[in-house]
Amino acid sequence: MREESPSLQGSPLPIRAELRRKEKYQYKQSITNMGNPKAFLTIHRQEAGYRPVHERIDDFSEVEQTLNSSDRRTQASRCMDCGVPFCHWACPLGNKQPEWQDLLYKGRYKEAYHVLEQTDDFPEFTGRVCPALCEKSCVLKLSCDEPVTIRENEAAIVEAAFREGYVQPIQPVRNGKKVAVIGSGPAGLTVANQLNRKGYEVTVFEKDELPGGLLRFGIPNFKLGKHIIDRRIRIMEQEGILFRVNTMVGKEILAKDVVKDFDAVCVAIGAEVPRDLSIEGRHLRGVHFALELLSQQNRILEGIPIPPKSQINCKGKKVLVIGGGDTGSDCVGTANRHGAACVTQIEIMPQPPVGQNPATPWPMYPQVLKTSSSHEEGCIRRWNLASNRFIGEKNNLIGVEVEEVEWVPSPDGGRPQMRQTGKKEIIEADLVFLAMGFLHPEQEGLIKELRLATDNRDNIAVDNAGYTANSNL
């Protein structure tokens, strides 16, 4: 339900402790042996793959395909149930991959889902957009470079759970306490979900038109269809969570009133301030932050009106993306779907090695060259290029002067140092999207109103338990 919440004052709650506790699912059968202990010797890794390029660049539907149930279970059988499961070690959520892979192989989808949801509140999200640290730490990655398709298996389990009706609203026993969650991105939704199931009455405040945060307005639909978010939000609303959208705490509503009206407040507003590129010509028309393009496109697909003069259209344009990460890749895919004349992506750092990197050996997450579905659709990729200035004509962007740089070892053994080479060139561009990462939360509004202390990176200062100086915030 999305509505206003009544006022209630009370005492601070042990919220941190509540977030740590999750119900344990007991298997009907102890898993001591995998169903097919030699499958990894005879069965090769098979990915679902992407839809054909010529088809997918004409729409914003999800690009990743799915395997049939038989093939998916066969892929799950490749898990070796290692004595030391490095997949579990690598997963930030602590997922129990060997357990639910075995259950998937045996066709016990309901049990597999219950094991999965112990550690992952929203596997339908992570099963689509997680970078799959677990797969990079799989022993089969080390031995034959064919890790188990863990991420895809995870997505298959949760989709089967929704399809078969295993995912149902839970009506918890209320404890009489109220909690406000500020922000409805992945962190905010997780906090809301866990506390609601512990009996707290949870209200989520979201500044945008719909819940989801970065999931909704940052990640393109071709990676995460928004019907997936809507499906989960409906479940959460049926469980009693209130969503107040178009409500920016610190602007539309005073932060001090939220603190006063709830027993506890969880701040989950994300690091939304992007890294800027303050060089000559930054003011020119055609220079945008990456999220300006991505959030606008997602709003258009949601049917949210965008003033014509504010719309960014890459059709027939020469597009330059500055920044080589996932956000930059998302800009590439979006520009291609607009019908850009050409798309170039540049990165100031050196090109990562292909395949393996001695600096990040197994089971660490490898710093190697990654080629996304967006790159496959058409993109010129270049490295070791620094941007010197934006070039304009009649206040419109027409190009960017870039300079080749070198990275040399630091004399003190620290990070490599950048050295300019003097080799300059101009890359023609009608549109530039800055995708150089994010810095910290927005300081205006909630942080300033409550005078919250921040650290030297402008993040909210908290103690080891995650609390601010305010005992219930």
For each feature predicted by the language model, list its residue ranges:
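Feature captures the FAD/FMN-dependent oxidoreductase FAD-binding
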Residues: 173, 178-182, 230-279, 388-409, ...
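Glycine/serine-rich phosphate-binding loop and adjoining beta1-alpha1 elements at the start
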Residues: 77, 89, 95-172, 237, ...
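FAD-site-proximal beta/loop scaffold in flavoenzymes
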Residues: 283-316, 409-473
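Beta1/beta-strand and adjacent pyrophosphate-binding region of the FAD-binding site
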Residues: 174-184, 315-322
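Short phosphate-coordinating micro-motif centered on Lys-Gly-acidic
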Residues: 72
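Intrinsically disordered, glycine-rich low-complexity segments
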Residues: 2-3, 21-22
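Low-complexity, intrinsically disordered or signal/transmembrane-proximal segments
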Residues: 9, 25-29
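Beta1-alpha1 glycine-rich phosphate/pyrophosphate-binding loop at the start
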Residues: 38-65, 94-106, 111-120, 147-151, ...
